[in-house]
């Protein structure tokens, strides 16, 4: 009975630290990754996105691992889905004034 109590008192602080680590770091990061993945899967033609390089582009076509994007009126490119930072909403679109 004494050994069991010693093991519990030894492992309890480690368990508490693990739970704190999980709820403060791991869980929020997983939720953010899930939200980002859903955003990428929901992108359609005409959506404006910002790449991780800072370019603002318009989605022309969604493929399995890439997007065909329009950089300007006469330039198109393919962008890996891994490099999409976020989607521009109407409220966050920068003004050209």
Swiss-Prot record:
Return one Gene Ontology term, BP aspect.
protein transport
| Source domain of life | Bacteria
Q: Which InterPro entries does this chain map to?
A: Preprotein_translocase_YajC (IPR003849)
SMART domains listed in its UniProt record = YajC
Q: Which Pfam families match?
A: YajC (PF02699)
Q: How does it sit in the membrane?
A: Single-pass membrane protein
The record's subcellular locations are: Cell inner membrane
Which GO cellular component term is one of those annotated? plasma membrane
Keywords tagged on the record: Cell inner membrane, Cell membrane, Membrane, Protein transport, Translocation, Transmembrane, Transmembrane helix, Transport
- TM stretches of this protein: 6-26
Similarity remark: Belongs to the YajC family.
UniProt subunit comment: Part of the SecDF-YidC-YajC translocase complex. The SecDF-YidC-YajC translocase forms a supercomplex with SecYEG, called the holo-translocon (HTL).
Name the chain's protein.
Answer: Sec translocon accessory complex subunit YajC
């Amino acid at each position: 009975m004494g050994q069991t109590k010693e093991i519990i008192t030894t492992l309890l602080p480690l368990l508490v630290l693990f739970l704190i680590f999980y709820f403060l770091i791991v869980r929020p990061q997983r939720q953010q990754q899930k939200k980002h993945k859903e955003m990428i899967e929901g992108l359609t033609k005409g959506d404006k996105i910002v790449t991780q390089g800072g370019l603002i582009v318009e989605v022309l076509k969604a493929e399995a691992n890439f997007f065909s994007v329009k950089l300007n009126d006469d330039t198109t490119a393919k962008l890996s889905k891994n490099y999409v930072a976020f989607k521009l909403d109407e409220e966050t679109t920068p003004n050209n004034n």
